[in-house]
């Protein structure tokens, strides 16, 4: 069984002693001293110990994870010993977060290189590569030719890379693996990642040190086991960094909830007054459609206060360029208010926020804390948040969540177990890479926390299903792998195996999206649901990214539109999923 230990804080002078002079000079030019998470984490990572660091948002967890790794790579770079391989993998559940880390990792490295030039110290170039769903084909090809030393990616992209011989060769001696925002993986994406981490272990000739970063969650022991897996020879240290941050959280009712006559007007008047009282406000809704609706209403109800230069919508259906532009404008203080669904919940750096508004119940105290942590992102600042409730159910839920937050009670995370759909997908991906002995495959899967108690019969049922032992031809479901019961081996079947795998990877609910482009410039704006498009006719006006567009025509998988400013939307809203209520709540 996996052994768990409690981390102990180390002295600042002990950490300083292991830092390369360039890294030390850079660090103390930015920070006065080591933060609490750094005193718990840096030395353990340097000593190659698996560690889970749990601390509130804004407590420098990410830098804690990277500091020892950057230090190690700078030492190798000075000795001209950097090889063309991946030394560290950083995986996060958000594409936006990966982009942010990429940016914030490159900048410290560039500053360290400038210091080296001033001191006439020659350093090899430390390469950082970003591989997500947004990465272009050209960038992927460039990465395949020359491996990055630090790979920033998502769980799904990492699984894809582990089916590619070139990248598996680059990962043969990977030394570090950072799993950020681990609390956001208490779902089938987490289950998927748990096997991907075991695949990474199998691909590497050495054990990749696991570094887990999490907001304040419980139970930490189970999360730590999820990080390193289940085996007698595995150990993990837990750094539960308790940092008491001042919290100012209130539940505000929008008008009279008994007489629900004119709540819309009351809601936007209340929002406007709260926004005006603060410098920068971040508003969370629970769906993309609500995000668009709020931005549109604020623009129409208060046209002199809110325009494209002061307010923006942010969600996953916007184009990469639009998302990055909004994040940058928010970070630099150019926007007064940003409305988002869940896309800015996690630890992406968005600059100074002094108020977080949560429209309706966030459905769990853990999510509410994560959202609240965006306000006063630095530790010494007060996190100020307001729940705006629109009905009595919301009032009860938000009241309970507020009480849990004030009492420091955290919703427990639960990782699903023995998900056979995820298992089928992972086995298929592994068979694409190479021929496996089924007993070795079963042992690898059993090391995953989420499959440590997987019945052998269930495993072989999945193998039989993938091998086509079930008569499913009438449903156009055919064998994906071959299985030889005599030799106990499996492998891929068919020339289209990789294409099938790549086009069906992951556990994020499938949505059929159509790209929205401006006419005649062909500039991508975002994407809309196919079902939403079916309801539109030529000339309809809809909202995307807080801006209004007139639908012109559809060509292939693209919708062509032109911007409008004086017309109101003619089609109500588009579709997106609601958030689930947490089990504890």
Language-model segments: which ranges?
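Helicase motor core with emphasis on the C-terminal RecA-like subdomain
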Residues: 2-15, 22-25, 39-40, 46-52, ...
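N-terminal pre-Walker A segment at the start of P-loop NTPase domains
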Residues: 21-35
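Conserved nucleotide-binding/hydrolysis modules and their immediate coupling elements
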Residues: 474-584
């Amino acid at each position: 069984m996996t052994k768990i230990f409690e981390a102990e804080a180390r002295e600042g002078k002990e950490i300083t002693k292991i830092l390369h002079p360039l890294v030390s000079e850079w660090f103390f030019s930015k920070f006065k001293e080591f933060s609490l998470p750094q005193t718990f984490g840096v030395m353990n990572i340097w000593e190659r110990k698996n560690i889970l660091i749990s601390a509130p948002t804004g407590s420098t967890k990410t830098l804690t994870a990277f500091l020892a790794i950057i230090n190690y790579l700078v030492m190798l770079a000075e000795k001209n010993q950097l090889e063309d391989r991946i030394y560290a993998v950083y995986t996060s559940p958000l594409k936006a977060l990966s982009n942010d880390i990429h940016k914030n990792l490159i900048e410290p490295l560039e500053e360290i290189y400038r210091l080296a030039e001033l001191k006439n110290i020659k350093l090899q170039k430390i390469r950082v590569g970003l591989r997500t769903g947004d990465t272009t084909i050209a960038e992927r090809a460039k990465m395949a030719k020359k491996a990055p030393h630090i790979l920033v990616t998502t769980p799904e992209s990492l699984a894809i890379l582990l089916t590619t011989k070139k990248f598996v060769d680059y990962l043969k001696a990977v030394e570090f693996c950072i799993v950020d925002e681990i609390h956001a993986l208490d779902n089938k994406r987490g289950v998927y990642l748990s096997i991907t981490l075991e695949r990474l272990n199998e691909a590497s000739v050495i054990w990749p040190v696991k570094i887990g970063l999490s907001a304040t969650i419980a139970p930490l022991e189970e999360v730590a086991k999820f990080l390193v897996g289940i085996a007698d020879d595995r150990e993990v240290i837990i750094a539960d960094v308790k940092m008491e941050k001042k919290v100012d959280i209130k539940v505000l009712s929008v008008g009279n909830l008994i007489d629900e006559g004119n709540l819309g007007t009351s809601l936007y008047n209340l929002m406007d007054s709260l926004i005006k009282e603060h410098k920068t406000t971040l508003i969370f809704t629970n769906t993309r459609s609500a995000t668009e609706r709020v931005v549109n209403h604020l623009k129409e109800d208060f046209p002199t206060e809110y325009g494209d230069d002061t307010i923006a919508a942010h969600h996953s259906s916007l184009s990469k360029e639009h998302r990055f532009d909004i994040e940058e404008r928010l970070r630099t203080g150019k926007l007064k208010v940003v409305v988002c669904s869940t896309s800015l919940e996690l630890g992406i750096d968005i600059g100074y926020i002094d108020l977080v508004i949560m429209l309706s119940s966030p459905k769990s105290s853990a999510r509410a804390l994560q959202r609240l942590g965006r306000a006063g992102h630095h530790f010494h600042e007060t996190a100020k948040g307001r729940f705006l409730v629109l009905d009595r159910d919301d009032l009860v839920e938000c009241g309970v969540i507020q009480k849990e937050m004030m009492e420091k009670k955290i919703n427990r995370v639960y990782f699903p177990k023995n998900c056979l759909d995820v298992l089928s997908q992972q086995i298929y991906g592994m068979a694409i890479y190479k021929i496996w002995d089924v007993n070795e495959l079963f042992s690898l899967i059993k090391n995953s926390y989420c499959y440590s108690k997987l019945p052998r019969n269930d495993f072989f049922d999945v193998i039989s299903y993938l091998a086509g032992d079930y008569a499913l031809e009438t449903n156009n479901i055919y064998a994906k792998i071959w299985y030889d019961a005599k030799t106990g081996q499996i492998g891929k079947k068919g020339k289209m195996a990789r294409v099938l795998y790549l086009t069906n990877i992951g556990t994020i609910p499938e949505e059929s999206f159509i790209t929205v482009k401006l006419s005649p410039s062909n500039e991508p704006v975002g994407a809309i649901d196919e079902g939403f498009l079916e309801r539109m006719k030529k000339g309809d006006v809809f909202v995307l990214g807080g801006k209004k567009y007139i639908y012109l025509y559809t060509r292939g998988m693209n919708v062509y539109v032109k911007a409008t400013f004086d017309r109101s939307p003619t089609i109500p809203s588009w579709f997106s999923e609601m958030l689930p209520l947490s089990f504890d709540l």
